[in-house]
Amino acid sequence: MYLNQKLRGSLTKRCGERRNVMNDRMIKVNILGEQKEYPYGTTYEKIVQEYQSKYEYPIILLMKDCKLCELHKKLKKEGTIEFITTQDQIGYETYRRSVSLLLLKALHYVGGYDNIRKVTMHYSVSSGYYYTIDGDIVLDEKFLSKVKAYMLELVERHVPILKRSVGTEEAMELFHNHKMYDKEKLFYFRRVSRVNIYSLEEYEDYFYGFMASHTGYLKHFDLYLYDDGLVLQLPKRESPNEVPPFAPRPKIFQVQKESAQWSETIQADTVGDLNERITKEGANNLILIAEALQEAKISQIAEQIVQAGNRKFIMIAGPSSSGKTTFSHRLSIQLAAHGMKPHPIGVDNYFVNREDTPLDSNGNYNFECLEAIDVKQFNEDMSALLRGEEVELPRFNFKTGLREYKGDFLKLGEEDVLVIEGIHCLNDKLSSSLPSESKFKIYISALTQLNIDEHNRIPTTDGRLIRRIVRDARTRGASAKATIGMWNSVRRGEEENIFPYQESADVMFNSALIYELAVLKLYAEPLLFSITKEEPEYAEAKRLLKFLDYFLGVPSESIPSNSILREFVGNGCFDV
Protein backbone atom coordinates (compact mmCIF):
# COMPACT_ATOMS: atom_id res chain seq x y z
CA MET A 1 0.00 0.00 0.00
CA TYR A 2 1.45 3.41 -0.98
CA LEU A 3 1.05 6.75 0.81
CA ASN A 4 -0.64 9.38 -1.34
CA GLN A 5 1.60 12.20 -2.50
CA LYS A 6 0.03 14.84 -0.22
CA LEU A 7 0.45 12.74 2.96
CA ARG A 8 4.00 11.79 1.99
CA GLY A 9 4.90 15.46 1.51
CA SER A 10 3.40 16.34 4.89
CA LEU A 11 5.42 13.65 6.70
CA THR A 12 8.64 14.70 4.95
CA LYS A 13 8.08 18.30 6.01
CA ARG A 14 7.46 17.32 9.65
CA CYS A 15 10.58 15.08 9.75
CA GLY A 16 12.64 17.94 8.35
CA GLU A 17 11.28 20.31 10.97
CA ARG A 18 12.10 17.79 13.72
CA ARG A 19 15.67 17.46 12.43
CA ASN A 20 16.05 21.24 12.40
CA VAL A 21 14.84 21.45 16.00
CA MET A 22 17.36 18.74 17.01
CA ASN A 23 20.16 20.50 15.17
CA ASP A 24 19.36 23.84 16.78
CA ARG A 25 19.21 22.66 20.39
CA MET A 26 22.08 22.94 22.87
CA ILE A 27 23.53 19.89 24.63
CA LYS A 28 24.67 20.16 28.26
CA VAL A 29 27.83 18.31 29.30
CA ASN A 30 29.96 18.18 32.43
CA ILE A 31 33.68 18.76 31.76
CA LEU A 32 36.23 19.05 34.59
CA GLY A 33 33.44 19.84 37.04
CA GLU A 34 31.95 22.58 34.83
CA GLN A 35 28.57 22.64 33.10
CA LYS A 36 29.04 23.51 29.43
CA GLU A 37 26.68 23.79 26.48
CA TYR A 38 27.46 22.99 22.85
CA PRO A 39 25.29 22.86 19.73
CA TYR A 40 23.91 19.45 18.86
CA GLY A 41 26.35 17.70 16.50
CA THR A 42 29.52 19.51 17.65
CA THR A 43 32.50 17.24 17.01
CA TYR A 44 34.47 16.09 20.03
CA GLU A 45 37.58 17.41 18.32
CA LYS A 46 36.18 20.95 18.49
CA ILE A 47 35.53 20.54 22.21
CA VAL A 48 39.05 19.19 22.71
CA GLN A 49 40.55 22.27 21.05
CA GLU A 50 38.97 24.39 23.76
CA TYR A 51 40.61 22.37 26.56
CA GLN A 52 43.93 21.24 25.06
CA SER A 53 45.88 24.13 26.63
CA LYS A 54 45.07 22.73 30.09
CA TYR A 55 46.97 19.50 29.30
CA GLU A 56 50.68 18.94 28.78
CA TYR A 57 50.16 16.14 26.25
CA PRO A 58 47.81 15.84 23.26
CA ILE A 59 44.24 14.74 23.92
CA ILE A 60 43.74 11.87 21.48
CA LEU A 61 40.46 10.29 22.72
CA LEU A 62 37.77 11.04 25.26
CA MET A 63 35.46 9.16 27.56
CA LYS A 64 31.76 10.04 27.34
CA ASP A 65 29.77 8.54 30.21
CA CYS A 66 32.31 5.70 30.68
CA LYS A 67 32.41 4.99 26.94
CA LEU A 68 35.53 5.57 24.83
CA CYS A 69 35.00 7.85 21.84
CA GLU A 70 37.16 8.91 18.91
CA LEU A 71 37.35 12.64 18.30
CA HIS A 72 35.59 12.61 14.92
CA LYS A 73 32.38 11.59 16.73
CA LYS A 74 29.65 14.17 17.35
CA LEU A 75 27.98 15.28 20.57
CA LYS A 76 24.33 14.23 20.59
CA LYS A 77 23.42 13.51 24.23
CA GLU A 78 23.99 15.11 27.61
CA GLY A 79 26.57 13.54 29.89
CA THR A 80 30.06 13.74 31.36
CA ILE A 81 33.22 14.06 29.28
CA GLU A 82 36.73 13.05 30.38
CA PHE A 83 39.79 13.60 28.23
CA ILE A 84 42.41 10.95 27.42
CA THR A 85 45.92 12.07 26.51
CA THR A 86 48.81 10.22 24.93
CA GLN A 87 50.24 9.71 28.43
CA ASP A 88 47.21 7.68 29.53
CA GLN A 89 47.55 3.98 28.76
CA ILE A 90 44.61 3.85 26.34
CA GLY A 91 45.67 7.08 24.64
CA TYR A 92 49.26 5.90 24.41
CA GLU A 93 48.23 2.66 22.68
CA THR A 94 45.99 4.67 20.35
CA TYR A 95 48.98 6.81 19.38
CA ARG A 96 51.21 3.81 18.69
CA ARG A 97 48.50 2.10 16.66
CA SER A 98 47.89 5.25 14.61
CA VAL A 99 51.59 5.72 13.80
CA SER A 100 51.64 2.08 12.66
CA LEU A 101 48.89 2.93 10.16
CA LEU A 102 50.93 5.96 9.06
CA LEU A 103 53.98 3.74 8.46
CA LEU A 104 52.02 1.13 6.50
CA LYS A 105 50.52 3.79 4.25
CA ALA A 106 53.98 5.31 3.65
CA LEU A 107 55.66 1.96 2.93
CA HIS A 108 53.08 1.09 0.29
CA TYR A 109 53.12 4.58 -1.24
CA VAL A 110 56.92 4.89 -1.44
CA GLY A 111 57.57 1.24 -2.32
CA GLY A 112 54.66 0.99 -4.74
CA TYR A 113 51.48 -0.96 -4.02
CA ASP A 114 52.31 -3.52 -6.72
CA ASN A 115 55.84 -4.02 -5.38
CA ILE A 116 54.96 -4.83 -1.77
CA ARG A 117 53.42 -8.22 -1.16
CA LYS A 118 53.29 -8.19 2.64
CA VAL A 119 54.40 -6.04 5.57
CA THR A 120 54.46 -7.83 8.93
CA MET A 121 54.65 -6.31 12.40
CA HIS A 122 56.49 -8.75 14.64
CA TYR A 123 57.47 -7.80 18.18
CA SER A 124 58.64 -4.96 20.37
CA VAL A 125 62.24 -3.78 19.92
CA SER A 126 63.70 -0.92 21.96
CA SER A 127 60.72 1.44 22.30
CA GLY A 128 59.09 0.47 19.03
CA TYR A 129 58.01 -2.31 16.70
CA TYR A 130 60.03 -4.53 14.38
CA TYR A 131 58.68 -4.99 10.84
CA THR A 132 59.72 -7.07 7.86
CA ILE A 133 58.79 -6.43 4.23
CA ASP A 134 58.20 -9.06 1.55
CA GLY A 135 58.38 -7.32 -1.80
CA ASP A 136 60.38 -6.09 -4.76
CA ILE A 137 62.13 -3.25 -2.96
CA VAL A 138 65.60 -2.62 -1.55
CA LEU A 139 65.27 -1.90 2.16
CA ASP A 140 68.15 0.48 2.80
CA GLU A 141 68.79 3.90 4.34
CA LYS A 142 67.76 5.67 1.13
CA PHE A 143 64.39 3.90 1.03
CA LEU A 144 63.85 4.46 4.76
CA SER A 145 64.59 8.18 4.52
CA LYS A 146 61.98 8.50 1.74
CA VAL A 147 59.42 6.68 3.88
CA LYS A 148 60.12 8.92 6.88
CA ALA A 149 59.92 12.08 4.76
CA TYR A 150 56.54 11.00 3.38
CA MET A 151 55.27 10.19 6.89
CA LEU A 152 56.26 13.68 8.06
CA GLU A 153 54.52 15.17 5.02
CA LEU A 154 51.30 13.36 5.98
CA VAL A 155 51.65 14.62 9.56
CA GLU A 156 52.05 18.19 8.30
CA ARG A 157 48.92 17.85 6.13
CA HIS A 158 46.66 16.68 8.99
CA VAL A 159 45.14 13.99 6.78
CA PRO A 160 41.91 12.57 8.28
CA ILE A 161 41.96 8.95 9.46
CA LEU A 162 38.52 7.82 8.35
CA LYS A 163 36.47 5.02 9.83
CA ARG A 164 33.64 3.09 8.24
CA SER A 165 31.64 0.08 9.33
CA VAL A 166 31.08 -2.78 6.88
CA GLY A 167 29.59 -6.25 7.11
CA THR A 168 31.98 -9.05 8.03
CA GLU A 169 31.60 -10.74 4.64
CA GLU A 170 32.37 -7.48 2.85
CA ALA A 171 35.39 -6.94 5.12
CA MET A 172 36.73 -10.41 4.33
CA GLU A 173 36.38 -9.72 0.62
CA LEU A 174 38.19 -6.39 1.06
CA PHE A 175 41.02 -8.10 2.97
CA HIS A 176 41.30 -10.74 0.26
CA ASN A 177 41.52 -8.11 -2.48
CA HIS A 178 44.24 -6.28 -0.52
CA LYS A 179 46.12 -9.59 -0.06
CA MET A 180 45.65 -9.36 3.73
CA TYR A 181 45.01 -13.08 4.00
CA ASP A 182 45.78 -13.21 7.76
CA LYS A 183 42.89 -10.81 8.40
CA GLU A 184 40.59 -12.71 6.05
CA LYS A 185 41.28 -15.91 8.00
CA LEU A 186 40.90 -14.14 11.37
CA PHE A 187 37.42 -12.86 10.56
CA TYR A 188 36.27 -16.24 9.33
CA PHE A 189 36.17 -17.18 13.02
CA ARG A 190 34.69 -13.90 14.31
CA ARG A 191 31.08 -13.81 15.48
CA VAL A 192 30.58 -10.07 14.99
CA SER A 193 28.35 -8.95 12.12
CA ARG A 194 30.22 -5.74 11.34
CA VAL A 195 33.86 -4.62 11.13
CA ASN A 196 35.42 -1.15 11.43
CA ILE A 197 37.76 -0.34 8.55
CA TYR A 198 40.19 2.58 8.85
CA SER A 199 41.50 4.43 5.83
CA LEU A 200 44.28 6.94 5.30
CA GLU A 201 43.66 8.33 1.83
CA GLU A 202 43.56 5.24 -0.43
CA TYR A 203 45.16 2.84 2.09
CA GLU A 204 42.64 0.68 4.03
CA ASP A 205 43.24 -1.64 6.98
CA TYR A 206 41.78 -3.08 10.17
CA PHE A 207 43.23 -2.27 13.59
CA TYR A 208 42.54 -3.70 17.01
CA GLY A 209 41.40 -0.54 18.81
CA PHE A 210 40.67 3.14 18.35
CA MET A 211 42.72 5.56 16.23
CA ALA A 212 43.64 9.25 16.19
CA SER A 213 41.28 11.41 14.14
CA HIS A 214 44.00 12.74 11.81
CA THR A 215 47.72 12.48 11.13
CA GLY A 216 48.53 15.81 12.78
CA TYR A 217 48.67 14.03 16.14
CA LEU A 218 51.45 11.70 14.99
CA LYS A 219 54.52 13.92 15.24
CA HIS A 220 56.88 11.79 17.28
CA PHE A 221 58.55 8.72 15.74
CA ASP A 222 61.72 7.56 14.03
CA LEU A 223 62.78 4.74 11.70
CA TYR A 224 65.83 2.48 11.93
CA LEU A 225 67.14 -0.41 9.87
CA TYR A 226 67.54 -3.47 12.08
CA ASP A 227 68.34 -7.12 11.35
CA ASP A 228 66.32 -8.12 8.26
CA GLY A 229 63.76 -5.34 8.63
CA LEU A 230 63.09 -1.98 10.20
CA VAL A 231 62.06 -0.61 13.58
CA LEU A 232 59.39 2.04 14.05
CA GLN A 233 60.77 3.78 17.16
CA LEU A 234 58.11 5.46 19.30
CA PRO A 235 57.95 7.50 22.52
CA LYS A 236 57.63 5.87 25.91
CA ARG A 237 54.42 6.43 27.80
CA GLU A 238 55.98 8.58 30.52
CA SER A 239 57.35 11.02 27.89
CA PRO A 240 54.98 10.79 24.90
CA ASN A 241 56.43 13.85 23.17
CA GLU A 242 59.99 12.48 23.06
CA VAL A 243 61.42 9.64 20.98
CA PRO A 244 64.16 7.89 23.01
CA PRO A 245 67.43 6.78 21.41
CA PHE A 246 67.29 3.44 19.63
CA ALA A 247 68.61 0.84 22.07
CA PRO A 248 67.94 -2.72 20.87
CA ARG A 249 68.53 -5.70 23.15
CA PRO A 250 70.08 -8.40 20.95
CA LYS A 251 69.58 -11.38 23.29
CA ILE A 252 65.87 -10.85 23.84
CA PHE A 253 65.42 -10.10 20.12
CA GLN A 254 67.05 -13.40 19.21
CA VAL A 255 64.73 -15.32 21.56
CA GLN A 256 61.70 -13.59 20.04
CA LYS A 257 62.95 -14.30 16.53
CA GLU A 258 63.52 -17.99 17.26
CA SER A 259 60.03 -18.31 18.76
CA ALA A 260 58.46 -16.58 15.76
CA GLN A 261 60.38 -18.82 13.34
CA TRP A 262 59.13 -21.90 15.18
CA SER A 263 55.55 -20.60 14.92
CA GLU A 264 56.01 -20.10 11.19
CA THR A 265 57.44 -23.61 10.85
CA ILE A 266 54.29 -25.17 12.30
CA GLN A 267 52.17 -22.66 10.34
CA ALA A 268 50.58 -21.05 13.38
CA ASP A 269 51.95 -17.52 13.65
CA THR A 270 48.61 -15.68 13.79
CA VAL A 271 45.39 -16.15 15.74
CA GLY A 272 43.60 -17.13 12.52
CA ASP A 273 46.18 -19.87 11.93
CA LEU A 274 45.75 -21.12 15.50
CA ASN A 275 41.96 -21.21 15.21
CA GLU A 276 42.21 -23.06 11.89
CA ARG A 277 44.47 -25.73 13.40
CA ILE A 278 42.13 -26.15 16.36
CA THR A 279 39.10 -26.66 14.08
CA LYS A 280 40.84 -29.01 11.64
CA GLU A 281 43.09 -31.06 13.94
CA GLY A 282 41.94 -30.36 17.49
CA ALA A 283 44.23 -28.77 20.06
CA ASN A 284 45.77 -31.90 21.60
CA ASN A 285 48.59 -32.36 19.10
CA LEU A 286 49.49 -28.66 19.19
CA ILE A 287 49.59 -28.75 23.00
CA LEU A 288 51.95 -31.75 22.98
CA ILE A 289 54.26 -30.14 20.40
CA ALA A 290 54.44 -26.85 22.34
CA GLU A 291 55.12 -28.63 25.63
CA ALA A 292 57.77 -30.86 24.04
CA LEU A 293 59.55 -27.80 22.67
CA GLN A 294 59.65 -26.18 26.11
CA GLU A 295 60.93 -29.37 27.74
CA ALA A 296 63.70 -29.58 25.14
CA LYS A 297 64.67 -25.96 25.85
CA ILE A 298 64.78 -26.59 29.61
CA SER A 299 66.92 -29.68 29.04
CA GLN A 300 69.32 -27.62 26.90
CA ILE A 301 69.63 -25.03 29.68
CA ALA A 302 70.40 -27.77 32.21
CA GLU A 303 73.14 -29.09 29.90
CA GLN A 304 74.61 -25.59 29.59
CA ILE A 305 74.73 -25.28 33.38
CA VAL A 306 76.49 -28.62 33.72
CA GLN A 307 78.97 -27.74 30.97
CA ALA A 308 79.66 -24.33 32.55
CA GLY A 309 81.09 -26.14 35.58
CA ASN A 310 81.00 -25.19 39.26
CA ARG A 311 78.05 -22.78 38.98
CA LYS A 312 76.57 -23.09 42.45
CA PHE A 313 73.96 -20.34 42.11
CA ILE A 314 71.34 -20.58 39.36
CA MET A 315 69.80 -17.09 39.39
CA ILE A 316 66.33 -16.90 37.77
CA ALA A 317 64.53 -13.60 37.18
CA GLY A 318 61.64 -12.43 35.07
CA PRO A 319 58.57 -10.20 35.12
CA SER A 320 55.29 -11.02 36.83
CA SER A 321 53.44 -14.13 35.65
CA SER A 322 56.28 -15.46 33.51
CA GLY A 323 56.06 -18.86 35.20
CA LYS A 324 59.30 -18.55 37.18
CA THR A 325 58.27 -20.97 39.91
CA THR A 326 57.21 -23.83 37.63
CA PHE A 327 60.26 -23.23 35.45
CA SER A 328 62.58 -23.49 38.46
CA HIS A 329 60.95 -26.82 39.43
CA ARG A 330 61.27 -28.23 35.92
CA LEU A 331 64.85 -27.02 35.63
CA SER A 332 65.62 -28.66 38.97
CA ILE A 333 64.29 -31.98 37.65
CA GLN A 334 66.48 -31.70 34.55
CA LEU A 335 69.51 -30.83 36.69
CA ALA A 336 68.80 -33.87 38.87
CA ALA A 337 68.65 -36.00 35.71
CA HIS A 338 72.18 -34.76 34.99
CA GLY A 339 73.39 -35.95 38.41
CA MET A 340 73.16 -32.65 40.28
CA LYS A 341 71.35 -31.96 43.57
CA PRO A 342 69.27 -28.79 43.15
CA HIS A 343 67.84 -26.83 46.10
CA PRO A 344 65.19 -24.21 45.31
CA ILE A 345 65.36 -20.92 47.22
CA GLY A 346 62.96 -18.00 46.89
CA VAL A 347 64.48 -14.56 47.41
CA ASP A 348 61.12 -13.58 48.93
CA ASN A 349 62.21 -15.49 52.05
CA TYR A 350 64.75 -12.72 52.58
CA PHE A 351 62.18 -9.93 52.74
CA VAL A 352 62.85 -7.49 55.55
CA ASN A 353 60.20 -7.58 58.27
CA ARG A 354 56.99 -5.88 57.17
CA GLU A 355 57.48 -2.89 59.45
CA ASP A 356 60.84 -2.20 57.78
CA THR A 357 59.54 -2.44 54.21
CA PRO A 358 60.03 0.79 52.19
CA LEU A 359 56.96 2.73 51.08
CA ASP A 360 56.21 3.88 47.54
CA SER A 361 55.10 7.38 46.53
CA ASN A 362 51.50 6.51 47.46
CA GLY A 363 52.43 5.37 50.94
CA ASN A 364 51.97 1.66 50.16
CA TYR A 365 54.50 -1.08 50.91
CA ASN A 366 56.95 -1.42 48.02
CA PHE A 367 57.79 -5.12 47.93
CA GLU A 368 59.39 -4.87 44.49
CA CYS A 369 62.34 -2.58 45.25
CA LEU A 370 65.72 -4.07 46.17
CA GLU A 371 65.54 -2.39 49.58
CA ALA A 372 62.62 -4.69 50.47
CA ILE A 373 65.21 -7.52 50.56
CA ASP A 374 67.70 -8.04 53.38
CA VAL A 375 70.59 -8.01 50.91
CA LYS A 376 73.22 -8.13 53.66
CA GLN A 377 71.80 -11.33 55.20
CA PHE A 378 71.28 -12.92 51.79
CA ASN A 379 74.93 -12.34 50.87
CA GLU A 380 76.18 -13.62 54.22
CA ASP A 381 74.17 -16.84 53.89
CA MET A 382 75.09 -17.47 50.25
CA SER A 383 78.79 -16.76 50.87
CA ALA A 384 78.79 -19.14 53.83
CA LEU A 385 77.20 -21.86 51.69
CA LEU A 386 79.81 -21.28 48.99
CA ARG A 387 82.54 -21.78 51.62
CA GLY A 388 81.00 -25.16 52.49
CA GLU A 389 79.48 -24.06 55.80
CA GLU A 390 76.11 -25.19 57.11
CA VAL A 391 73.50 -22.41 57.08
CA GLU A 392 70.00 -22.15 58.54
CA LEU A 393 67.77 -20.68 55.85
CA PRO A 394 64.84 -18.38 56.67
CA ARG A 395 61.19 -18.62 55.71
CA PHE A 396 59.16 -15.45 55.37
CA ASN A 397 55.74 -15.63 57.00
CA PHE A 398 53.48 -13.55 54.77
CA LYS A 399 50.69 -13.58 57.37
CA THR A 400 52.76 -12.15 60.22
CA GLY A 401 55.13 -10.16 58.01
CA LEU A 402 58.15 -11.64 59.81
CA ARG A 403 61.15 -13.71 58.74
CA GLU A 404 61.27 -16.99 60.69
CA TYR A 405 63.85 -19.72 61.30
CA LYS A 406 62.54 -23.27 61.79
CA GLY A 407 65.56 -25.52 61.51
CA ASP A 408 65.88 -25.55 57.72
CA PHE A 409 69.64 -26.20 57.49
CA LEU A 410 71.63 -26.62 54.28
CA LYS A 411 75.22 -27.46 53.42
CA LEU A 412 76.44 -27.64 49.84
CA GLY A 413 78.32 -30.68 48.57
CA GLU A 414 80.10 -31.05 45.26
CA GLU A 415 76.92 -31.84 43.30
CA ASP A 416 74.65 -29.39 45.14
CA VAL A 417 73.37 -26.23 43.43
CA LEU A 418 70.97 -23.52 44.56
CA VAL A 419 68.13 -22.64 42.19
CA ILE A 420 67.31 -19.09 43.29
CA GLU A 421 64.22 -17.32 41.99
CA GLY A 422 63.36 -13.65 42.44
CA ILE A 423 62.79 -10.44 40.51
CA HIS A 424 66.24 -9.05 41.44
CA CYS A 425 68.27 -12.15 40.64
CA LEU A 426 69.94 -10.62 37.57
CA ASN A 427 70.92 -7.50 39.51
CA ASP A 428 74.46 -8.02 40.83
CA LYS A 429 73.68 -5.75 43.79
CA LEU A 430 71.62 -8.60 45.22
CA SER A 431 74.54 -11.04 45.15
CA SER A 432 77.52 -8.66 45.20
CA SER A 433 79.62 -10.89 47.49
CA LEU A 434 79.37 -13.92 45.20
CA PRO A 435 82.00 -14.40 42.46
CA SER A 436 80.53 -13.98 38.98
CA GLU A 437 81.95 -17.38 37.97
CA SER A 438 79.77 -19.03 40.64
CA LYS A 439 76.52 -17.69 39.11
CA PHE A 440 74.49 -18.81 36.11
CA LYS A 441 71.85 -16.23 35.20
CA ILE A 442 68.55 -17.06 33.50
CA TYR A 443 65.97 -14.56 32.27
CA ILE A 444 62.44 -15.88 31.76
CA SER A 445 59.48 -14.12 30.19
CA ALA A 446 56.28 -14.95 28.33
CA LEU A 447 57.15 -13.59 24.88
CA THR A 448 54.00 -14.26 22.89
CA GLN A 449 54.79 -15.82 19.49
CA LEU A 450 51.39 -15.08 17.98
CA ASN A 451 50.14 -11.98 16.18
CA ILE A 452 46.46 -11.16 15.91
CA ASP A 453 47.23 -10.63 12.22
CA GLU A 454 50.06 -9.23 10.12
CA HIS A 455 49.54 -5.65 11.37
CA ASN A 456 48.26 -6.22 14.91
CA ARG A 457 50.64 -7.79 17.42
CA ILE A 458 49.80 -9.23 20.82
CA PRO A 459 51.68 -7.27 23.49
CA THR A 460 53.56 -9.62 25.81
CA THR A 461 52.16 -7.70 28.77
CA ASP A 462 48.60 -8.68 27.72
CA GLY A 463 49.43 -12.38 27.90
CA ARG A 464 51.01 -11.94 31.33
CA LEU A 465 48.12 -9.83 32.62
CA ILE A 466 45.59 -12.49 31.59
CA ARG A 467 47.74 -15.16 33.27
CA ARG A 468 47.83 -13.01 36.42
CA ILE A 469 44.06 -12.38 36.44
CA VAL A 470 43.38 -16.12 36.25
CA ARG A 471 45.97 -17.08 38.88
CA ASP A 472 45.04 -14.31 41.35
CA ALA A 473 41.39 -15.30 41.19
CA ARG A 474 42.22 -18.97 41.80
CA THR A 475 44.91 -18.65 44.48
CA ARG A 476 44.07 -15.39 46.26
CA GLY A 477 40.39 -14.88 45.55
CA ALA A 478 41.31 -11.55 43.94
CA SER A 479 38.92 -9.96 41.47
CA ALA A 480 39.90 -9.08 37.91
CA LYS A 481 39.21 -5.48 38.89
CA ALA A 482 41.85 -5.63 41.64
CA THR A 483 44.45 -7.26 39.39
CA ILE A 484 43.91 -4.75 36.58
CA GLY A 485 43.96 -1.90 39.10
CA MET A 486 47.44 -2.76 40.35
CA TRP A 487 48.93 -3.81 37.00
CA ASN A 488 50.43 -0.42 36.15
CA SER A 489 52.28 -0.45 39.46
CA VAL A 490 53.60 -3.94 38.69
CA ARG A 491 54.73 -2.78 35.25
CA ARG A 492 56.57 0.21 36.71
CA GLY A 493 58.42 -2.13 39.06
CA GLU A 494 59.42 -4.35 36.14
CA GLU A 495 60.71 -1.41 34.12
CA GLU A 496 62.88 -0.37 37.05
CA ASN A 497 63.98 -3.68 38.57
CA ILE A 498 63.93 -6.36 35.85
CA PHE A 499 64.13 -5.19 32.24
CA PRO A 500 67.37 -3.16 32.64
CA TYR A 501 69.22 -6.36 33.62
CA GLN A 502 67.77 -8.89 31.14
CA GLU A 503 70.68 -8.66 28.68
CA SER A 504 73.10 -9.75 31.44
CA ALA A 505 71.52 -13.22 31.46
CA ASP A 506 73.60 -16.21 30.34
CA VAL A 507 70.50 -17.69 28.76
CA MET A 508 66.88 -16.69 28.13
CA PHE A 509 63.76 -18.83 28.25
CA ASN A 510 60.43 -18.02 26.60
CA SER A 511 57.63 -19.43 28.74
CA ALA A 512 54.78 -18.49 26.38
CA LEU A 513 52.85 -21.41 24.92
CA ILE A 514 51.33 -20.93 21.51
CA TYR A 515 47.97 -22.38 22.59
CA GLU A 516 47.69 -20.79 26.04
CA LEU A 517 45.38 -17.84 25.29
CA ALA A 518 42.81 -20.24 23.83
CA VAL A 519 42.78 -21.98 27.23
CA LEU A 520 43.04 -18.89 29.44
CA LYS A 521 40.09 -17.37 27.54
CA LEU A 522 37.67 -19.80 29.22
CA TYR A 523 38.94 -18.81 32.69
CA ALA A 524 39.42 -15.08 32.15
CA GLU A 525 36.20 -14.10 30.37
CA PRO A 526 33.81 -14.67 33.32
CA LEU A 527 36.19 -12.73 35.60
CA LEU A 528 36.40 -9.79 33.19
CA PHE A 529 32.63 -9.68 32.68
CA SER A 530 32.25 -9.01 36.42
CA ILE A 531 33.68 -5.49 35.98
CA THR A 532 30.89 -2.94 35.49
CA LYS A 533 31.04 0.11 33.24
CA GLU A 534 30.98 2.44 36.26
CA GLU A 535 34.37 1.12 37.43
CA PRO A 536 37.67 2.66 36.25
CA GLU A 537 38.95 -0.74 35.10
CA TYR A 538 36.01 -1.26 32.72
CA ALA A 539 37.73 0.09 29.59
CA GLU A 540 40.69 -2.27 30.07
CA ALA A 541 38.38 -5.21 30.82
CA LYS A 542 36.38 -4.49 27.67
CA ARG A 543 39.60 -4.32 25.61
CA LEU A 544 40.78 -7.67 26.97
CA LEU A 545 37.38 -9.26 26.31
CA LYS A 546 37.48 -8.05 22.71
CA PHE A 547 41.00 -9.43 22.40
CA LEU A 548 40.03 -12.86 23.81
CA ASP A 549 37.03 -13.00 21.49
CA TYR A 550 39.42 -13.55 18.57
CA PHE A 551 40.35 -16.98 19.99
CA LEU A 552 38.44 -20.24 19.87
CA GLY A 553 38.32 -21.72 23.36
CA VAL A 554 40.24 -24.87 24.29
CA PRO A 555 39.57 -26.88 27.50
CA SER A 556 42.48 -27.52 29.85
CA GLU A 557 42.12 -31.31 30.28
CA SER A 558 44.90 -32.16 27.80
CA ILE A 559 47.50 -29.88 29.40
CA PRO A 560 50.27 -31.86 31.15
CA SER A 561 50.42 -31.53 34.94
CA ASN A 562 53.94 -30.09 34.80
CA SER A 563 53.06 -27.41 32.24
CA ILE A 564 53.92 -23.81 33.03
CA LEU A 565 50.28 -23.02 32.24
CA ARG A 566 49.24 -25.17 35.23
CA GLU A 567 50.78 -22.51 37.49
CA PHE A 568 47.88 -20.29 36.41
CA VAL A 569 44.89 -22.57 35.72
CA GLY A 570 45.64 -25.05 38.52
CA ASN A 571 45.85 -28.85 38.90
CA GLY A 572 49.61 -28.89 38.43
CA CYS A 573 52.02 -31.36 39.98
CA PHE A 574 54.17 -28.70 41.65
CA ASP A 575 53.44 -26.81 44.86
CA VAL A 576 53.34 -23.29 43.40
Language-model regions: role of each:
Residues 309, 431-576:
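Conserved NTP phosphate-binding and transfer environment spanning the P-loop NTPase/kinase superfamily
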